[in-house]
Design a protein with these regions (language model features):
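A generic short-segment signal for beta-strand/edge and adjacent turn/coil regions
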Residues: 1-7, 33-42
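Flexible, glycine/small-residue-enriched loop-and-beta-strand segment within the central core
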Residues: 29, 36-136
Length: 137
């Protein structure tokens, strides 16, 4: 089923500003009504937000991104999840567990490669500025 354009693009003729909620397909990402994203570099497609802006977000971790209603997210904002944080409690920062098959580890050991920081939760009516980096925890 196609989403009507007016539900994605709030302004006629503007393909750089979108409402995020209708373009998110990942069930671990929740976005409130009227939250908008603007990517004004005229190169990237703002509808690719969950691919280009939500980073190191792997299902094995079970972490979530929640963004409230009426938020304004500007060009280049990134959300970094747990997998971007290599563990500091090991002999090495090398992420051995992500190569679980090669090293004969159980897939459940993958999450031991990084320090668990938790979900990212953004409240209602929050402005996230140009190229901001929001980290888990």
């Amino acid at each position: 089923m196609a989403i009507p354009e007016k539900e994605i693009y709030p302004r006629t003729g503007d393909r750089q500003t979108i409402y995020l909620k209708p373009v998110i397909t990942d069930p671990s990402i929740t976005v409130g009504e009227y939250t908008m994203y603007n990517y004004n570099d005229f190169v990237h497609d703002p509808t690719d937000f969950q691919t280009n802006n939500v980073l190191y977000h792997y299902p094995v971790n079970g972490d979530r991104l929640t963004i409230g209603k009426f938020c304004s997210i500007t060009c280049g904002a990134k959300f970094l999840f747990t997998s971007a944080n290599h563990t500091m409690r090991s002999l090495s920062t090398y992420p051995f567990p992500i190569f679980y098959e090669e090293w004969g580890l159980d897939i459940r050991d993958v999450t031991k490669a990084w320090d668990k920081k938790g979900d990212i939760v953004i409240g209602n009516d929050v402005w996230i500025g140009y190229e901001a980096v929001i980290m888990a925890g």
